[in-house]
Each structure stands twice: as C-alpha cells, then as structure tokens.
Amino acid sequence: MKLSRQFTVFGSAIFCVVIFSLYLMLDRGHLDYPRGPRQEGSFPQGQLSILQEKIDHLERLLAENNEIISNIRDSVINLSESVEDGPRGPAGNASQGSAHLHSAQLALQADPKDCLFASQSGNQHRDVQMLDVYDLIPFDNPDGGVWKQGFDIKYEADEWDREPLQVFVVPHSHNDPGWLKTFNDYFRDKTQYIFNNMVLKLKEDSSRKFIWSEISYLAKWWDIIDNPKKEAVKSLLQNGQLEIVTGGWVMADEATTHYFALIDQLIEGHQWLEKNLGVKPRSGWAIDPFGHSPTMTYLLKRAGFSHMLIQRVHYSVKKHFSLQKTLEFFWRQNWDLGSTTDILCHMMPFYSYDIPHTCGPDPKICCQFDFKRLPGGRYGCPWGVPPEAISPGNVQSRAQMLLDQYRKKSKLFRTKVLLAPLGDDFRFSEYTEWDLQYRNYEQLFSYMNSQPHLKVKIQFGTLSDYFDALEKSVAAEKKGGQSVFPALSGDFFTYADRDDHYWSGYFTSRPFYKRMDRIMESRLRTAEILYHLALKQAQKYKINKFLSSPHYTTLTEARRNLGLFQHHDAITGTAKDWVVVDYGTRLFQSLNSLEKIIGDSAFLLILKDKKLYQSDPSKAFLEMDTKQSSQDSLPKKNIIQLSAQEPRYLVVYNPFEQERHSVVSVRVNSATVKVLSDLGKAVEVQVSAVWKDMRTTSQAAYEVAFLAHLPPLGLKVYKILESQSSSSHLADYFLYNNDGQAESGIFHMKNMVDSGDAITIENSFLTLGFDRSGLMEKVRRKEDNKQQELKVQFLWYGTTNKRDKSGAYLFLPDGQGQPYVSLRTPFVRVTRGRIYSDVTCFLEHVTHKVRLYHIQGIEGQSMEVSNIVDIRSVHNREIVMRISSKINNQNRYYTDLNGYQIQPRRTMAKLPLQANVYPMSTMAYIQDAAHRLTLLSAQSLGASSMASGQIEVFMDRRLMQDDNRGLGQGVHDNKITANLFRILLEKRNGMNMEEDKKSPVSYPSLLSHMTSAFLNHPFLPMVLSGQLPSPAIELLSEFRLLQSSLPCDIHLVNLRTIQSKVGKGYSDEAALILHRKVFDCQLSSRAMGLPCSTTQGKMSIPKLFNNFAVESFIPSSLSLMHSPPDAQNTSEVSLSPMEISTSRIRLR
C-alpha cells in the first residue's frame, strides 16, 4: 500500500513536469509572423532562420525535459528500493527503519571534462620515481667503512684545477618547540640566549652568517626585547648575515599532519615576519622531521619558495642517491602533468644534521671540527679524538684534514658548490660557543683561501647563499636546455636511520592527541569562517560589543597553539610526558576559547535584528552540545533540559561547502520529545538510550537523533521541546551473549538467548552481517546485490626480544600480529531505529561499534566505525584493527599524504614488517579490477596491508622502554582514546590491474572525498543557553553564508581574517583558500545524491557569498607573502586540478 502511494505521488510529479515543460516549450515556441499581408507561396528568409532557431531551442528543451524525467525516474527507483528494504519484523534480522529520501534532491553528475585529469595522470616521465627506487635498492646494509652506511669515497687531486671547490659553511641552531622540556622552559633556559648572543656576535664581523627557522621562538623573544635589539636584527637581515629559513611557526612533522594545519602554521609564521621584520623566506629547511612528504614540497613551492633542504631519509636511499649523484633534484608532484610544481631540493647525505655528520663521510674527523667539544667542555667526541683549537702551528694540517672531508663529500654531488651545515640542537646558547666556532673557522677559512694550490673558496653563508651559488654554477654548465639535476617524484617514508630501525611507531604514538588535533582543526576552521563573516556584519551594523571583543586575539592564540602542535615532536607523540600535557593543555584551552568565538559569531549571524546583539564575556549565548572537562578526557555530550512550555533553540552549523543532509544527535532529559524544523514542522526523531555502562540505561538522559538538511556553510534553527504528542520513535535493543541483567527502562530490550539467527543490520544501500561476537563478517551492496566477505578483526603486536625494542619513534615487532583473544564471549548490543542502526561489541580493551544511517545520499553509503580503545593495563603491546576481504590487491595499497594526495604503496617481502607501515592522515585503500575498499579516518594513524585483501590500522601502542632516540622514556601515558572511521566499498568499472601497477598516482572517488569531509567536519549543534536574552530578540530560521553549493570538487580550506599591519588587531581583508580535488570517475556513483556539480574549476566570486558583497578579490601566493606580477582585482577563479590557491578578499 505504501509503495503504490509513493509511486502515485511521483507519477503525478512526472506528469506535472511533462505538462509544464510542454507548456513552456509551446509558449517559448510561439512565432511572431509579419503583420502585413502574406504573399501566397512565399516566406521571408529571415523568418526561416528564426523558425530554425526556435526548432533547435525546442529540441534542447526536450532534451532537458528528458533529463529531468530520467532523474525523477531514478529517484522513484531508489524510493521503491528503500520501501522494499523496510522493516522485516523478526528481532534477529535487520529492521532498517525508514530510508529517508531527500526532498527535491537529484543526483547530479560530474562534467566528463573533470574526469580527464585523473585518466591522464600516471603516464608522465620522471627521471627518478621513488616506487621504482625501492625495487632497485637491495637493502642489504653492508659495512661501508668510516661512512658505515655508505661507501669509500675517492678523488683525484687535480679535479678542482679548472673550477675550485666553493664551500658554504652554514651555522644554525635547531630549537625544538618542546621535546624534553616544554616550549616555555626551552625558551627560558636556552633559546632567548641564542638570540641575545646572535645579535652581539654577528655584529662583530660582517662575514659571519646564521640561519633561523622556528618563528614561534622568534615571536616570543621579540615580545620581550627593546627597540635597539629589534633594529639590530633588522640590520642583520638586510645585510644578509641572518636568514630566516622556511619561516613557519614550527618545523612541522610531515607524516601525521593535515595540510590545513601545515598551511595555517606557514601563514602564521610568514604573516608575523611580514609585519615585524618585512622579510620573505625563500629557502626551506627541514632537518629533523622523520621522513619527508611531497605535500610540504608543494606548499613551499606555492608559497613562493625556490629551493629546500631535507635530512631524515632512509639510509639506503641516501646511499643509492649518493652513488647516482642524485642528492640534488627537482622534486615534482606525482600528479603534475608538466613541471609547474618543480622545486630544487638538497638531500643531506649522512646520518645526522649534527657537526660530526655534516662536513664529510668520516664522523671521527668531522667531530674534531666541532669546537664546542674542545677538551675541558661538557661535551666530547664519542670517537675518542677531541678537537684542537686552531693556531698558526696547526692550521695547515687541520685545514688539509677538513678540506679532505669537504672534497669527499662534494664527490656525491654534480657541481663544485658544497654545503656544510654547522650546528646541532640548541647550539650557540652560550656566548663562548660563538667565539669558539666562529674564530676557529675564521682561521681555517683564512688559511684555505690564501693557498691557491688548494683550489678552494670557503666562507660562512646562509642557505640561500648556497642555493644562489649553486644555481649560478648550474647556469654556467647548462647546455642545450638539459637540466643538471633530475626530476624526482614520490615521498620519503618510511624512514630508517640504521639497521631495521624503522620510524613507523610515531605514526600512531599518543593517538588521543592526534584525534584532538583533528577536532581542533575543524573547530578553528569553523571559528575563522564564522568570525570573519560576523565581523563584516558587526562593521556594517556598527555593533561595538562584537568589534571590541578580544575574539581576534583569542583566534590568533588558537592558531599559534595549533601551529605549535604541528611540531615534529608534538603531533608525533614523541615528547616527554609533561611536555605532552603542556601541548594538550594548550589545545584544550584553545578549543574552549574557540567555542566562545563560534557561539558569539553564530549568534550574531542568526539574529534577525543585528543591532540587538548582546554578549556575556563569561559565556556564550550559544554553547556547544559537547564538553571536554580536561585536556586528557574524552568529550561528553551535554544534557539539554527540556520543558513543555518553552522550546529550547538548537542552532546547527554545516561546516561543509555543499548543501548537506546529515544526522544531528543531541542529549535531552526527556524521552517524550518533539523537534521542530525551521518551518515549524515536526521532524522524525529517533530516541535512543544513553548508557551508564554496557547494560544500564540512564533514566535522566536520552539521545535524540534527527535528519537535518542544511545549506552550504549555513546555520539553521531547530526547536526542541517536551511533548506527549511527539513523533519520536524509540530505538529497540537486542542483546547477545548477555550473562547479566540489563535495565531496559522505557525501551524494548530483548535477550537473544540461543538464537541461531545471524546478526544483520541494513539500509537502502548495504546489508551487513556479523558473527556472534559482534564483529562484521560480510557485506551486500544492494547496487549489484552481491555479497562479499568483509571481516573486522583485532590484533596485538608485541615487541622484539632483542636489545633495541619499540618505543615512541620505532616499531620493532616480535613477528606477525596475533589475533585478539577475548577472555569470554563478548557482550553484543544491537540497536535498531528509524534514523540509524548499529552493532556494538564489548571487548576488554575495545568497545567497537559499526553503524548504518538510514539516509539516502552520502552518509548512507558507508559504514561508520567507532572504537573506544583502552590499553592502559597492557605492557609492550600495540593494538590493530584489520579489515579483510577477497579483494586481490596484489601487494599494492594506497595511503594518503596529509589529507592532500594519494601515494601508492607496495608490501615488499625484502623489507621487514615494520617498513611496510606508512602514515595515514585521512584514508587508505586497496583495490582490484572490480572493487575498491577504503578506510576513511578522522585521525592520523599508521596503516598497512600485510596480506592480500587486508587493510590494517594501528589504534594505540603502550611501550615500557625508550627506543634510544633521545626521548629517554617509553610511551605509557595512554588515555581512553576514541578512534573514528568510515568503511566504503565501491565498484570499479572496467579497470586494468596492470595499469594500476604501473601508475604512480591514484585518486579517491568523489564519494570518498565527500565521505572524508563529512567525517572530519561533522555538523556542529549549538544550544541557546536558557532563554533569549531579551523578548525583543528573534532568530532567523536559517542563515546562508554561501549563495549556493560550491562545485563538488572544490573545498573551501579556510576564510582567515588577515592581521592588521599595525597593532594586534585585524585588517579588512581575509585569506580565501580554495582547493580543487581530483577524483577517479571509474568508480560507481549511482544515486550518490550529491547536491552539487563540477565546473572545471571555475567559480564566480561575486556570486559566492550570500548577504555579503565582494569589494575586491586579488590572487596571492599560498601564504600571502607574494602577489603575482599581474595580480589585479578579478571576478572569477579558475583552479587547475589538485591546486590550492589563496586570494585576498574584502567583503562588505
């Protein structure tokens, strides 16, 4: 009956569309014949052409009409399927609830031209492709002599006769913004003295040089020094003695970071430099991140950098590159069809960035030229031979010894220009070291430069001094347009510094804070966008209470705390326990302060009369529906107190740039609840239990879930009230393996004792089957009605019994992962409802939940997986979730890099297990010719594919010992940690696995991109605290920030208010950052329900924002440092595939 009624409605809709379209066609097709007398047998030529145009127009209208009817037909088919998949009755099988069909939403298609880029990628030539390099390297690690991981280097004495060796010695100090001490403690004890001495000691001699990287420290020092010191720093920068390299807020990790935060900390550093020093960095310096990503390379290139340096690369790769003389190369993006992303990169060849490993291949000799280690000091040389102070009596022999190392090192490169860094961690903090290093080297330089037969020119230099000399040398050698340096594509993970010591442990270490970081990124982005638009409204309506608020100062602090956490010993989980607490406290405090900014900004935007805006410094009128009580606790949902007399206002924000249908879930104090939409209509509600523990329901709190439809970047108001006439539906519960007494309260709860029925849940897209332990076993996609194996298992990895064991950095397992064995059959709880259904399995160390949403569109097509992990009781174990399928991926799998691009991987038998673990920021997938299985992640973790058909993700690790990389402790401060995922199974169309094997690139589907965005940017519900501040205040039903959805493949990365050039306030401009994503069209997109289309990267800027006019829109470099030479106000953006662009926008 229900089915026929739905068909009647939609049949009527089709009939109406047809009749209305025909009416329009006839109306538009009416011809204006001449009013004069008609001559028999003649028809004017002009009228014939008009008639032909009308006929052509009618044909186009018919085609459009056919397309509309086709779309409606597809919607009817989807509806019929959803109705057929309705409740089935028996408790053991799925009752999927209602499958919601989005009103007036048709599945839009991508423009075929937007599919071309992905299909063309992968055929372009590279001189060096890192996937191929791994095939070539034997990884046999023979003893190389004095250069243990290398080989013996020889040279002829006359090699520099035609062109002398040019050496640049670059003094530096690597300052971790937190590691063994907190950021503040390091600054107090070390860094401030480095800066103070730098100003004094560089002024003593104009030939002295120094480079600095971390702006977080420089900004902190700048705030406490006097004007004469500030002027001295500016003078050193102007005359080239001091160079700022990279200039980010920190030297960021490149494995576990997301590109949003990488860009943000770059902008924060570069904006600070522009305002305070007027300098623009042009050389990248990354000597300590544990492996290197091409994402960072791309960001530097688009920020305007010309060259960069990296250090921590697998020792076997360094050896291979040294043999091939490819340590300097143009690093090109895998996806680049041309060479627009090329940036010149220098890879340091030896073990470390310290002085013993930077002058040449023999650390025993190089250590003798680290003059801080002179006898009588605190440090010595581990090789047993101390440095000697340089004097007239030994300068000749010492100079020749050092020059020999420089010459040997130069043999690994293709030019006669050599870089020799001079520094280490927190060096130059004592004024005596400045004297010891500079004065001794000055004597060596003076001697070498005075001896023509040595054929060397040596000096102190900055990093850019070196690269400028290198490019000058190359320009002289260049013949016939052939580059001296090869083009390279790929990444440099996973890093190993010696033996089988792979640094794949830190991809997962301290996962609690990796998740907290991702939440912070989403909240900061929300605060940035809402604040800027609220600021524009406040300026328009002269709302001084908002304009004078400390919000911009608070926002800047949040940016800096997030930036600090991108440091390569912060987000990586590789700092001391108390330093981790310091990072966590900063994030926690900023999350709280961002909630105030979001609440106040949203309140202003949703107000009908902006002039009635009020604010309370102590709290926001709009409060988040979740609260985190401390830096190391999981967020908990607040309970909204309802009454029948006065409704509570719930304002929901959609942080996504497309129109969106998603589930909103809040907690209330009553099960008899009604939710009213912005139109005042009751919406369908699922009321579920809030569980005190796995068997006991709360009598004071209930979860209310409903489907919300929100505009892009929009706010919508719902009302919630207690009502006996509510249209809510109570969820039903079915308990398996229950040996205790469950308290059901108002809910129907059934013990499934000795039931032979399989556990299943389903929606209109998927049917999932589970074993009696509550773990998923199989899935049926209703698109093709085929059932496939899809098993979820948990595993333990231990650590080796050798002397070196796993720690914060290293993963050194004791063999293959061992199945998780539960002490008893797990208790399983099945929820069945109208909005969602789920299966929860309670293990000793994991509470594992798989949920399906009964929604048409994006969220209904994947499985939500949440794991609450608690391994505080175990020792030297790492817990993993494995997803197994029959997909024949042939040892090939894919992980993303920084949420920006996909990197193909190969499980290599010649490498140890730990080498086949790679970083995953947002997704990993495997595929064969028929299917792709994607695991989407809301936090950065380590991932692998140890066998065909498998994806493994590491969820937490607890290790009781140090792994001898300087931290001096294990990882045993574990927290109860929430990991959130989605699993997506897609059909591939007509794919060739041989082409997959050859291709160095791969792209997610559009559905996968969208699902990842939904996962990382969920709806944000906010509750009006109490009643409205004044009876006169009214709220709009919704506030649309954008006029319409952005194209499906364009992501609004940020709308970031730009700082004022004076004071600590804001300017009139914002940085609008856009990213055009590339997607694979070879995956099924049937009935995806996308409320957007693609436009080949083109967007009209004047039509972008709703309620805001665009005064100016001027393209810029990524971090706002540069404007293109032809930069001018423009009205259209045209983004190329994969590109991220920043523009300065002024709204009113």
Swiss-Prot record:
Reactions listed under catalytic activity: N(4)-{beta-D-GlcNAc-(1->2)-alpha-D-Man-(1->3)-[alpha-D-Man-(1->3)-[alpha-D-Man-(1->6)]-alpha-D-Man-(1->6)]-beta-D-Man-(1->4)-beta-D-GlcNAc-(1->4)-beta-D-GlcNAc}-L-asparaginyl-[protein] + 2 H2O = 2 alpha-D-mannopyranose + an N(4)-{beta-D-GlcNAc-(1->2)-alpha-D-Man-(1->3)-[alpha-D-Man-(1->6)]-beta-D-Man-(1->4)-beta-D-GlcNAc-(1->4)-beta-D-GlcNAc}-L-asparaginyl-[protein]
Enzyme class at the top of the EC tree: hydrolase
A biological process term (GO) from this entry: vacuole organization
Pfam families found in the cross-reference section: Alpha-mann_mid (PF09261), Glyco_hydro_38C (PF07748), Glyco_hydro_38N (PF01074), Laman-like_dom (PF21260)
Cofactor binding remark: Binds 1 zinc ion per subunit.
Phosphoserine modified-residue sites: 80, 82
Molecular-function GO terms, alphabetical: alpha-mannosidase activity; carbohydrate binding; hydrolase activity; hydrolase activity, hydrolyzing N-glycosyl compounds; identical protein binding; mannosidase activity; mannosyl-oligosaccharide 1,3-1,6-alpha-mannosidase activity; protein homodimerization activity
Listed name of the protein: Alpha-mannosidase 2
Organism: Rattus norvegicus (Rat)
